[in-house]
């Protein structure tokens, strides 16, 4: 009984185990089935995961680039913030002042000038005090201490140097309205050669002069080397040349004889006469001749200076400027003359500036200009090497005090050329070597000299003939007398030169048109006619007497002028001078 019970129990246990095993087999089969399904699905999931990996990597790269851009933007923003902060800090700083360095002290402080005050201040360690120069600009902080060295002032007033003191650091200058002031020379002017009359740039607040100014009107008065003009180049003025040589060259070249005879050399010479007759040429030739005479006398290279001053360029609208220019002219002349060099001061158009005092219409500037010249001429007395030469075609308008003996002692009239003088002038322009027409040469045996001489003779006879075709003007004097004036009465060296130039131009045009080369007497005669015809309308002033005086006609006052020439096409003879409309130069 008991055995049956045990067997039944073992069987039941065995059945339970079999059931469990079957359950496990079933579960394993299901698990195997699941695994098989998963195994079948694995490649697809791998592909999905790979796609997701690639997508994630792309997103990561984009995020990385964006992050780098953000980093750069943040860095740039940080730099901008720093720069803005610096700008804000800089703008918030108090203003820096400027001062002028005056000098250094032994205790390390320096003296400066700023804001109209002289101050003694400290210096930043970054500034080398030993390198600071008087007059130099310095930068100041809020406490007015020097923190930086700068350059020199470049703006200021222009003043004229009157005297340089012995210490070489100070000078006496003349400002506007002839105000005198003592100033100091800044470092850039130390050692620069300065002389009275120089223009300086002054900073008026600090009292330092920084620069030498080359003013244009002063440069125009600088002494010029003498042009290469000789007496031989001047025609028709032999007697006048001899007079001026006696007045100028003899006293300079033979000063010992003049001292022995107790003869005072003339201080000046006045050359007067009609326009275009050689006054300026003579003055230049005098300087050139002096240089050559000095070279012959001393055996060394001769040198002289010619200071050509045109009257109108001296005039200045500011009071006192014209007088300053006159002082400057004579001061420069004295400087050159003190070296033993002859200096000629030549005033051209002297009547335009040194008129008779009281004759002015509006400003009467001559009331101060004339006395200035008189004092300068009188000051030349002690200088042997300065000669004053004046030129004018209206000597009657020059102040009598200038013309009196002791100032412009010698007065030389430059006359209009007569026939012989005209031949001499023509010979200066018609010289051997010019191309002459073969026909004209053949008439005189092929001789250039004979041909030119004959040409000159023909054209001079044409110019100086008192014929109907040479009648120019009929003048009526105040007493009622009338006189006919011919072109020869208004001839000049300048007109002769113009005639020769016209003839040469005609010869050139003929050669270009016909191929026939050379100057002919017909060219000279035609040029003479053209020159006369052009002069028909020139006497155009409404005051006949003034025009006559400028043209060299003196004597009875002229009240009426009538033209007699009818050289131009369309012009009529016998017109009153008041009806002439065209303008032109004086004859």
Curated annotation (Swiss-Prot):
Gene3D superfamilies: 1.10.8.60, 1.20.5.170, Nucleic acid-binding proteins, P-loop containing nucleotide triphosphate hydrolases. Pathway: Protein degradation; proteasomal Pup-dependent pathway. Residues 586-587 are annotated as: Docks into pockets in the proteasome alpha-ring. SUPFAM superfamilies: P-loop containing nucleoside triphosphate hydrolases. Keywords: ATP-binding, Chaperone, Coiled coil, Nucleotide-binding, Proteasome. PANTHER family: AAA-FAMILY ATPASE, PROTEASOME-ASSOCIATED ATPASE. Consists of three main regions, an N-terminal coiled-coil domain that binds to protein Pup and functions as a docking station, an interdomain involved in ARC hexamerization, and a C-terminal ATPase domain of the AAA type. This is Proteasome-associated ATPase. The lineage of its organism: Bacteria, Bacillati, Actinomycetota, Actinomycetes, Streptosporangiales. The gene is arc.
